[in-house]
């Protein structure tokens, strides 16, 4: 709201996302909670609220409204990657009708593949919270991501992600592994199964 007051309604995500800026906007809730944690950093991983919600919802789309309050951790990675003032720039330099992902890609001159690579790096760092600014506060939370898996009925040794927790676009999933003896070679093979029964099937020609 304040960005829109200062720079006009075509900035600051005061418009909604989607066609002709007709949708909603929960990103400000995410950034508001993130900003609060910059004022009270010792609470980001200890307040018993948003981190627990993050563990529950991180498979959702990055802008999904169901975790608009708990989606307040990716901002730390974005600031590590692009500077401590980046979230402020993202708000000020957004252009209607961009959503935050579209603005992020434009500001950082990223195509779709490069953006996905950056997100992948960020989520890999979240496995151990190896992110500047939160590394010390979060070290006691390493290993607390929950794996929602079940053995596939058709193949021995094959695991599937539960349909309720399949990662949506820009969501993520972390699978905790049992440790083995040092030097042991471990191999895993991943396969996306587009159109599988029990899962949403939209644009399956672009999935899998």
Functional labels for PLM-detected ranges:
Residues 1-47:
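Zinc-dependent metallopeptidase catalytic helix centered on the HExxH motif
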Residues 1-20, 53-58, 112-114, 120-127, ...:
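Proteins with a high burden of low-complexity, intrinsically disordered sequence enriched in S/T/G/P/A and R
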Residues 2-4, 32, 89, 183, ...:
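Generic low-polarity alpha-helical segments
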Residues 52-129:
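Active-site-proximal alpha-helical
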Residues 97-208:
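Beta/coil-rich, acidic/histidine-enriched accessory regions frequently appended to metallopeptidases
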């Amino acid at each position: 709201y304040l960005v829109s007051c200062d720079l006009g309604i075509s900035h600051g995500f005061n418009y909604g996302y989607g066609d002709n800026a007709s949708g909603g906007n929960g990103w400000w809730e995410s950034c508001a909670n993130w900003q609060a944690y910059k004022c009270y950093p010792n609470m980001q991983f200890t307040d018993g609220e948003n981190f627990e919600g993050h563990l529950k919802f991180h498979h959702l789309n990055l802008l999904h409204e169901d975790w608009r309050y708990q989606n307040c951790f990716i901002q730390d990675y974005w600031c590590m990657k692009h500077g401590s003032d980046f979230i402020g720039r993202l708000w000020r330099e957004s252009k209607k009708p961009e959503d935050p992902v579209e603005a992020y890609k434009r500001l950082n001159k990223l195509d779709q593949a490069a953006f996905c690579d950056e997100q992948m790096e960020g989520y890999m760092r979240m496995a151990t919270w190896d992110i500047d600014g939160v590394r010390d506060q979060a070290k006691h939370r390493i290993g607390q991501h929950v794996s929602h898996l079940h053995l596939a009925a058709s193949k021995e040794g094959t695991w599937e992600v539960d349909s309720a927790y399949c990662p949506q676009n820009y969501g993520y999933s972390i699978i905790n592994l049992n440790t083995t003896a040092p030097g042991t070679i471990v191999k895993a093979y991943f396969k996306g199964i587009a159109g599988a029964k029990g899962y949403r099937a939209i644009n399956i020609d672009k999935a899998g």
